[in-house]
C-alpha cells in the first residue's frame, strides 16, 4: 500500500511540475508579445508578432531540446545552443523551423544507426552521437544569422520565394535552405555511405581507393544519400510553404525548393569531401585498425593537413553553399 502511495505522489509531483513549466512558458511568450506590441506602438515600422507565434517559438524548441537530451542526441551545451537556434528560426519563419527539425531528427537517428559498425573504423565515434554547442552552431549558427537578417528585412512570417517581388528575402530563404540542406547531405553521406557501400571509398582529389572513414572519401551510396538528405530538407520546407503561405496561386512556383534542396545536399557533400581531403588530416592507425584525425606515431598518413577539424569543414561548406545556391536559383527560378 505504501508503494502505491509513493507512486501516486511521484506522478502528482511530475504532473504539477509539468503544469508549472507550461505556465512559465505561457508567461514568457506573453511577455515577449507585450514587448513586441509596445515596440510596434512606438515604432510604426515594426509589426507586432502574434501571441500564438511567440508561444510556438518558445514552446516548440523546449520540447524538441528536451527530447534530444532524453534520447542523448544533445549534451547540456548543445541543448542551450539548440534552444537559441530553434527559437530564432521558429519565430522568423515556420518553413525555416521545419527544415531545421527535419535535419535534426533524421540526422540524430542516422548518427545512432549501426553504431557498432561505425566504432570499427571511426576513432572519434561517440556513443549516442551527442552534439555539443560547437556542432550545433557550426550547423545552425549560419541559418540563425540568416533568419535574423530575414526578420530585419521582412519581419517574422512566411512568404513565397519569388525573386521578382521579394528579391532580398527570397535570397535569404534560399541561402538558409542551402545551409541546412548542405549539412543534412553531408550527415547522410557520412552516416549511410560507409555502412551500406559495398565498394571501397575513393579519395575525391586523386580518385585512389582509401580506407572506410577517410576524410574526403566518396562512394556512390554516399553521394546518393547526400542527395536524398538535402531533398528531405527541401521537402519539409516546401510542404510548410503549402500549409502556411497564403495566395500561392498568384506567386512564383515553389516546387523548385525540393530540387534546390537536393542540389545543395549533393554539392555540399562534395565540397565537404574536397575540403576534408586537403585540410583535414587522415591517417590509418595500424594498431587499432581505425582512421585517426591527428598525426600519431602509429598512424600511417593517407591524406590532408591538420588545418581544420570536422566542425570547421562543415561550417565552411555550408557557407559556400549558402552563397552559391540563391545565386544559381535567381537565374533559373520560374517566373510568372
Swiss-Prot record:
Main location: membrane
Organism: Xenopus tropicalis
Compartment(s) of residence: Membrane
Membrane topology category: Multi-pass membrane protein
Protein family membership: Belongs to the TMEM19 family.
Pfam families: DUF92
Segments crossing the lipid bilayer: 19-39, 49-69, 86-106, 224-244, 250-270, 313-333
Classification via InterPro entries: DUF92_TMEM19
GO cellular component, one term: membrane
UniProt protein name: Transmembrane protein 19
Keywords: Membrane, Transmembrane, Transmembrane helix
Residue ranges that the Swiss-Prot or TrEMBL entry lists as coiled coil: none
